[in-house]
């Protein structure tokens, strides 16, 4: 059986699982893992096929969620960034008894633009899939540059993301394509109306991948959830605003 790479740090009485985004790995959390592990029992995970979780092909969202759950604590706060937000949301939908609270970061229940729904144009995602076959390292780097564009610290934030990617072997092209397919096709807007656990959604005002226009739309669709926008962040608020980010999670811990 293929194994998910999993690291546990800290000894807090609440478990917190962090799920990274497309093309990346758990090293992306190194800017906040020391701070968070002083408040939580922290679980860092490489999603199947990414980072050190080798031997997986392209998976559906449901299969990715089930693979991650195999090694997870019985109950935890699940936090997912970008693509990881869809994985955490899927777990909240299928195994609500395992989810103490759900946190999504710069994530959308439907990344792809639809009628009257802001998102990434489908042809942009299809273009990324095509370019992966031609020059996948450059394509991943372009995607990372998009994630930090517009912030005051854009250049150093992009460098931090690139360093994370290059620290470990690149994922296989079919795994990267599978992740883009999830971003292109999945729509959890309606299902997530039914989750009852505490649900916190974090966004960057300058995010070029998850438009801030979705925030009030989801506030209305999911009145049981809470949203917070980092005024000067883009797609990676935990890199550009680590102290503020950790503060929000510690405050959530007091409420669950």
UniProtKB/Swiss-Prot annotation:
Keyword terms of this UniProt record: Biotin biosynthesis, Cytoplasm, Hydrolase, Serine esterase
Gene inactivation effect: Cells display no detectable hydrolysis of the thioester and no trace of DMB-S-MPA.
Top-level class of the enzyme under EC nomenclature: hydrolase
A cellular-component GO term for this protein: cytoplasm
Notes on activation and inhibition: Strongly inhibited by phenylmethylsulfonyl fluoride (PMSF).
Binding site for substrate: 22, 82-83, 143-147, 235
Domain AB hydrolase-1: 15-242
Main location as per UniProt: cytoplasm
Temperature dependence as stated in the record: Optimum temperature is between 20 and 30 degrees Celsius.
GO molecular function, one term: pimelyl-[acyl-carrier protein] methyl ester esterase activity
Function: The physiological role of BioH is to remove the methyl group introduced by BioC when the pimeloyl moiety is complete. It allows to synthesize pimeloyl-ACP via the fatty acid synthetic pathway through the hydrolysis of the ester bonds of pimeloyl-ACP esters. E.coli employs a methylation and demethylation strategy to allow elongation of a temporarily disguised malonate moiety to a pimelate moiety by the fatty acid synthetic enzymes. BioH shows a preference for short chain fatty acid esters (acyl chain length of up to 6 carbons) and short chain p-nitrophenyl esters.
Protein name, entry field: Pimeloyl-[acyl-carrier protein] methyl ester esterase
Originating species: Escherichia coli (strain K12)
């Amino acid at each position: 059986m293929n194994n998910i790479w999993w690291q546990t740090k800290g000894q807090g009485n609440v478990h917190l699982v962090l799920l990274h985004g497309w093309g990346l790995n758990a090293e992306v959390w190194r800017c906040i893992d020391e701070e968070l592990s002083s408040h939580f029992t922290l679980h860092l995970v490489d999603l199947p096929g990414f980072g050190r979780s080798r031997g997986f092909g392209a998976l559906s969202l449901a299969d990715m969620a089930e693979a991650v759950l195999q090694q997870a604590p019985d109950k935890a706060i699940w936090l997912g960034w970008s693509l990881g937000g869809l994985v955490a949301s899927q777990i909240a939908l299928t195994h609500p008894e395992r989810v103490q609270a759900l946190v999504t970061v710069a994530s959308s229940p439907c990344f792809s633009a639809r009628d009257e729904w802001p998102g990434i144009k489908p042809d942009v995602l299809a273009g990324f899939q095509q370019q992966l076959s031609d020059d996948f390292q450059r394509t991943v780097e372009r995607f990372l540059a998009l994630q930090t564009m517009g912030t005051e610290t854009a250049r150093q934030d992009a460098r931090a993301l690139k360093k994370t990617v290059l620290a470990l072997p690149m994922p296989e092209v079919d795994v990267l394509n599978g992740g883009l397919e999830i971003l292109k096709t999945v729509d959890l807007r309606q299902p997530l109306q039914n989750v009852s656990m505490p649900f916190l959604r974090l966004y960057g005002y300058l995010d070029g991948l998850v438009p801030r226009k979705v925030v009030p739309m989801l506030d209305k669709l999911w009145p049981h959830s809470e949203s917070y926008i980092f005024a000067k962040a883009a797609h990676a608020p935990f890199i550009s605003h680590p102290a503020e980010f950790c503060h929000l999670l510690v405050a959530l811990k007091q409420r669950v």
